[in-house]
Amino acid sequence: MFNLRRLFASALFLGLGLLFLAQTAEAAKGPKITHKVYFDITQGDQPLGRVVMGLYGKTVPETTENFRALATGEKGFGYEGSAFHRVIKNFMIQGGDFTKGDGTGGKSIYGDRFKDENFKLKHTKKGLLSMANAGRDTNGSQFFITTVVTSWLDGKHVVFGEVLEGYEIIEKIENSKTGAADRPVEAVKIAKSGELDVPPEGLVGTSEFAAEEVASAGWSPMQKAGLFAIFAGVLFVGLRSARQHSRF
């Protein structure tokens, strides 16, 4: 009987250990990138280059679709030709107001404004895309790209993507000379925008995110293996115990 208990405990601890390792491995991967979009950016008459961004469509599908469709312009309106109207060094660069250009306009593909989808992802690093707003549930088309960790924005702004390529261009914009209302003296514009292909299995973002994002994504193969190990261990102990009892 003692050996059975020890075997049961070993199986249980093995399964729980596998679950822990699976959770840790998944957390190290970061959120799933389902779409890629690009901005070809100019400053004045000079091209700065292309910024490629990955969007977290599994975690925030509605916010991702809004940004993706505005990047392609498939609804008849979008980011192409609009400016980065607000730049604050050691904070962020902000754009997306394609109706007024001064931070008071813009609109979403769902109407004028749409609700905060969720706050599962945090502002844990530079190069993140997050929705600009005027308060709760006031998302439109305006967005910002972080240039530092901005944890004070957690729970207030929806993180939905990250810069994959061209972050040096973001740094150039961040270091632009600005005037009133933090507007760049020399206009910084999105000359062209669109969508790029993503492999069918998707891509994975970088790892500076809380484990709650992993939990929201469902069970991974490694986590399923851990559960199977626990189940198999318990089943084995149960069968062995039944055999021993059948001898008496």
Swiss-Prot record:
Top enzyme category: isomerase
MF annotations from Gene Ontology: cyclosporin A binding; peptidyl-prolyl cis-trans isomerase activity
Keyword Transmembrane: yes
Known EC number: 5.2.1.8
Lineage: Eukaryota, Fungi, Dikarya, Ascomycota, Pezizomycotina
Protein name: Peptidyl-prolyl cis-trans isomerase B
Reactions accelerated catalytically: [protein]-peptidylproline (omega=180) = [protein]-peptidylproline (omega=0)
Activity regulation (UniProt): Inhibited by cyclosporin A (CsA).
UniProt family annotation: Belongs to the cyclophilin-type PPIase family. PPIase B subfamily.
